[in-house]
């Protein structure tokens, strides 16, 4: 996924179909300078991760 699309999805009111390593996730924040995204698992919102934006996949 590219940074611009990740930013669009992070501010969208609708739940996006995004996955990280096969897990459905939500994007909380995108850090353009580091090209990373703060995400959490849909099924486990308490598990937050910072991952490279290019490791996210829109499904």
Swiss-Prot record:
Places the protein is found: Spore core
GO terms (BP aspect): asexual sporulation; sporulation resulting in formation of a cellular spore
InterPro entries (alphabetical): SASP_SspH
Keywords recorded for this protein, A-Z: Sporulation
Broad class of the protein's primary localization: other
Gene Ontology cellular-component terms listed: endospore-forming forespore
Induction: Expressed only in the forespore compartment of sporulating cells.
Pfam annotation, one family: SspH
Top-rank taxon: Bacteria
HAMAP family linked to this entry: SspH (MF_00667)
Family (UniProt): Belongs to the SspH family.
Protein name in the entry: Small, acid-soluble spore protein H 2
Organism lineage string: Bacteria, Bacillati, Bacillota, Bacilli, Bacillales
């Amino acid at each position: 996924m590219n940074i611009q699309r990740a930013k669009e999805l992070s501010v969208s009111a609708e739940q996006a179909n995004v996955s990280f390593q096969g897990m459905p996730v939500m994007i909380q924040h995108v850090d353009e300078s580091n090209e990373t995204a703060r995400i959490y698992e849909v099924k486990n919102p308490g598990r937050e991760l910072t991952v490279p934006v290019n490791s996210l996949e829109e499904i």
